[in-house]
């Protein structure tokens, strides 16, 4: 019997992703990464997505107060092996320590664009026009 393939993450992937997110957050909050760029930036980790085999963790981060996110993302990726090593004590239950990759989280920008679009005069006019038809 074959299992149906699904693109949705499993409960285990979600649970492990949340554990990895919490562990990375603690490493960054404690200032264990010695890098001027990382130490000078407040970094928000919104989500960690795990690969199906739990060997790759992709962390989606938003550097706050920085206009060029790519500099912070590059610094995090330079220190990814160090961060992976610091996750060990917090994730002892895992058979393999996942490789950590950092990506820029664009979801906040997408939400902002959608909000601006919904507040635009054209959309407001269309929404008000719908109420007149009823």
From Swiss-Prot:
Q: S-adenosyl-L-methionine: present as a keyword of the record?
A: no
What are its GO biological-process terms?
Answer: maturation of SSU-rRNA
* Domain of life (superkingdom): Bacteria
**PROSITE patterns, per this entry?**
RBFA
Q: Where is the protein situated, by its record's location annotation?
A: Cytoplasm
Cysteine-cysteine disulfides: none
Q: Which UniProt keywords apply?
A: Cytoplasm, Ribosome biogenesis
Protein name, per record: Ribosome-binding factor A
Q: What is the lineage of its organism?
A: Bacteria, Pseudomonadati, Pseudomonadota, Alphaproteobacteria, Hyphomicrobiales
Gene for this protein? rbfA
């Amino acid at each position: 019997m074959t299992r149906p393939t699904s693109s949705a993450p499993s409960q285990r992937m979600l649970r492990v992703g949340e554990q990895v997110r919490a562990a990375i957050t603690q490493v960054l909050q404690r200032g264990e990464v010695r890098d001027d760029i990382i130490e000078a930036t407040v970094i928000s980790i919104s989500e960690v997505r795990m690969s199906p085999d739990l060997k790759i963790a992709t962390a989606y981060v938003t550097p706050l107060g920085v206009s060029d996110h790519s500099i912070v993302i590059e610094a995090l990726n330079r220190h990814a092996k160090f961060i992976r090593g610091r996750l060990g004590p917090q994730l002892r239950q895992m058979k393999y320590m996942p490789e950590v990759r950092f990506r820029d989280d664009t979801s906040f920008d997408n939400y902002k664009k959608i909000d601006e679009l919904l507040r635009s005069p054209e959309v407001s006019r269309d929404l008000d026009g719908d109420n007149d038809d009823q």
